Amino acid sequence: ESLWSNVMLGHQGRRYRRGPWLRRKAARADTVDIIDSYDVRTPGSDIPALALSGGNQQKLIVGREMTAEPTLLIAAHPTRGVDVGAQAAIWEQLRIARGDGLGVLLISADLDELIGLSNRLLVIFRGALTADLDPSHVTPEDLGTYMAGRRQEQVA
């Protein structure tokens, strides 16, 4: 599928529908905005999404979800498998969105990502909350031990 049709995924019932018809022109315009705003490297919005690199696919997905103006974004491993440049771009967009008041639930195995993007870290091990941490006062090593089952003395 083309990039612009991918941008409509999950949003057909809202922004891109007028009665029984899809508003392709609106989807194409939003796709061009996402390409520009999120620095998606592509020759155009009509190419297949599979033709993009993994990093550019991730940036397109983040842009698509942000364009929907959510009140909560669940970002599960948003930078897994992407290059350093795409990772930095995605991190910056998440920081901007959080600064604008978007609630972001970040799920990641990348400890530096968790510490760098979070304003609060909650660690769950085997279904139980084991730690409630301030990312400005935790090291990746400490966070890793909580992820492996160590319990914080007082968990909120």
Pin down the residues of each PLM region.
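Glycine-rich phosphate-binding loops of nucleotide-dependent enzymes
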Residues: 1-156
